[in-house]
Amino acid sequence: MLALRRHFRLVLMLAVVLAAATPAAVRAQGKLEARYSATLAGIQIGKGSWVIDITDTQYMAAANGVTTGLMRVFTGGEGTSAAHGTLQAGQPMSSIFASTIAASHKTDDVSLTVANGIVTESRLDPPLETEPDRVPISDENRKGILDPMTASLMRTPGSGNPLSPEACQRTVAIFDGRLRYDLQFAFKRMDKVKADKGYAGPVVVCAVYFSPIAGYISSRAAIRYVSKLRDIEVWLAPIAGTRVLVPFRMQGPTPIGKFVLEANQFVSVPIPTRASANGLKTQ
């Protein structure tokens, strides 16, 4: 059971890495309703849902998930996360982030307030424990960051097809309240997907490389393991009406098999801009 719990913590860390990406900037607005299934070595271990709303002035993203099957028997877990922010010059700027994860009879709560990329307030329950080999989080580490939920939206630069290699060319600074880390993305290939409900079409596949910066315990095996991985992938699909791409599928190796998080529902619809809506009303 202890071994399963250790592997579960590793899977949770891998899921955090896979779920993070970069900020989005939109020319139009859209909404996404998605449902995901998580498997480990081909066995379902979890499921979740994700809702994203992007308007002309702000965005909202919320997700929840639970463990299922054998994983729930040994280490039941569930979690929720949400973020809200404004669009400044088309760029999402984090305002509020909150996350709650409950697993193995323990609950972890995090809330962040962010202004202009700088963390102005953070609340952790339980507080971050003092460990001799924990890399301290400095004030500088709290600047120029994205919260993990805001970081899950990727905007392709330019005016061409957003499903292009350029979507992957970036490095992102992320702070989740306890850990400051970088994710580096690199283009791997184009592929195709088909959800049971919703999107069917091309995706951009990016390689993802995790680099811990601060807040981590250097002796932790999970940190060392994920830092060395070179086989993590994220498959990006579009939110209709925007240049924003978000993860459709995420995968990476673990010591006991491949971890995969994949959408079985990916329903995305464009929302008319205010100018478009006003034009329709006058016709």
Which stretches of residues belong to each language-model region?
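Long, charge-rich C-terminal accessory regions
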Residues: 152, 156-158
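Coiled-coil-like amphipathic alpha-helices with heptad-repeat character
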Residues: 1-4, 22, 26, 42
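Bacterial N-terminal signal peptides that target proteins for export
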Residues: 1-13
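Acidic, serine/threonine-rich low-complexity disordered tracts
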Residues: 26-116, 159-283
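Internal, conserved structured core segments that host functional sites
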Residues: 105-149
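Bacterial N-terminal signal peptides
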Residues: 11-21
